[in-house]
Amino acid sequence: MPHFNASGILVPSIASTKKPSNSQTTRQRGWMPALVGAAVITTLLLIGGLVLAVAWPSVTNGFRRAAQSRDLQNMETIAQALNAYSDRYGTYPPPVVLDANGTPLYSWRVLILPFMGNEVLYKRFELSKPWNSPANQSLLNQMPSEFASSNSPDAAGTYETNYVLLTGPGTLFPTTGPLSRTQAEKNTILLVETNNMCSWTQPGDINIGRGLRVGQKPMVDVGGLHQGSFTAITTDEDGLRIPSDVPQAVLDALVTPDGGENVDVSTFVE
């Protein structure tokens, strides 16, 4: 009940002036570190997210370039073998080996095996028989790793290739017969990437008679393994990363061995 002193003034009760207990004070003090810790963690997460958002395009671009570099290494090995064949025999190999009746037998890839260090495998082929004859088909699983892209996971398992020649009028491989490396002007494309669809010994390249296109169709369009660009290699064994939206005139000029076009490929070079 209320308590008054001798002068009639209300005196506060003991209960109303009671200090907080030690346990209450401890709990109150314990909230502060927790709040500060939560604020610090939230800030760090926000900063980390911002850094990742800024850096991620560079990271993904690095992954893409590394993937393309692996393809270009494969293509350089193949180009070296093609050039060695040209130096030995005077021209590049025919895209398709034909029998006496004009029947397609097998691909140029079989012919360059000795120049890739695979002479033993080459000697196992029955060169008078087609690629899908029982004896030759049994060698499909001996495909050199350079013929398949690591960026096309099913290629190695199906023994299908990702690297092809460009054939047809105005190329290094016209219908009249293959040219030699000495007949090609600088920056002439020798080999390009494509989505796989044919076995490595099977005759199969991209004929540009209907026009050269960048796209996703296997063995028809150039490219398909990489986003935004495709890989190619020249007769000089220079690796190129060519944008998918390259002007058609530039693409056509890169294919022509003797067109006289002056094409700046400095931004494409590996």
Residue ranges, per PLM feature:
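N-terminal intrinsically disordered, acidic low-complexity segments at the extreme N-terminus
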Residues: 1-24
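Acidic surface patches and DE-rich sequence motifs
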Residues: 5, 99, 149, 167, ...
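N-terminal Sec-pathway targeting helices
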Residues: 25-47
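Conserved hydrophobic/amphipathic alpha-helical signal-anchor segments
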Residues: 49-142, 146, 152-155, 182-186, ...
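Short, solvent-exposed loop/turn segments at the edges of secondary structure
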Residues: 80, 107-108, 142-144, 158-160, ...
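Short clusters of hydrophobic/aromatic residues that line enzyme substrate/ligand-binding pockets
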Residues: 92-93, 125, 131, 163, ...
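Solvent-exposed loop/turn segments at secondary-structure junctions
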Residues: 153-156, 195-197
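Hydrophobic alpha-helical interface faces used for helix-helix packing
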Residues: 167-270
